[in-house]
Amino acid sequence: MNSQNPDDHEDTTVVGFEVPVSPVSSYNNVYSSTEDETRDPPAVPPHLQHSLLGNQGSMELAYAPQNVVLNHLYIENRDAPRSVVALGFSHRFRTKFVTVVIYKPVQRRGSANV
């Protein structure tokens, strides 16, 4: 071992086990450009596109939800403004699947309803 001060373990080196010098590029963190900030967020993965809120079929065709959609809160996505909004949540209770759908009136801006 090669050391100037026996109490200083920071500068102690063992032949063959020298710490390599860090490359300068590892400390060169470039800030993100403005084009990164203007991009749209990534699309939802395909397996999260299928929720019971988007199912237009009858209740006889109801399916068991995939594991990845359980315990997620979904909101109805409509282009046209509606007077109510639907929220949905599916979870597993033992061997059954329970889906709760809540309809809430939408308060329009500027309305006098309290």
UniProtKB/Swiss-Prot annotation:
Keywords: Carbohydrate metabolism. GO terms for molecular function: maltose binding; protein kinase regulator activity. InterPro entries: ASC_dom, ASC_dom_sf, KINB. Residues 40-114 are annotated as: Association with SNF1 complex (ASC). SMART domains: AMPKBI. Expressed in rosette (at the protein level). Expressed in the whole plant and at the different developmental stage with a higher level in stems. The keyword Heme does not apply. It comes from the Eukaryota. One of its GO terms (cellular component) is chloroplast. Regulatory subunit of the probable trimeric SNF1-related protein kinase (SnRK) complex, which may play a role in a signal transduction cascade regulating gene expression and carbohydrate metabolism in higher plants. Kinase-interacting sequence (KIS) is specific for the alpha catalytic subunit interaction and Association with SNF1 Complex (ASC) is specific for the gamma non-catalytic regulatory subunit interaction. Belongs to the 5'-AMP-activated protein kinase beta subunit family. Subunit of a probable heterotrimeric complex consisting of an alpha catalytic (KIN10 or KIN11) subunit, and a beta (KINB) and a gamma (KING or SNF4) non-catalytic regulatory subunits. Interacts with KIN10, KIN11 and SNF4. Interacts with FLZ1, FLZ2, FLZ3, FLZ4, FLZ5, FLZ7, FLZ8, FLZ10, FLZ13, FLZ14, FLZ15 and FLZ16. This is SNF1-related protein kinase regulatory subunit beta-3.
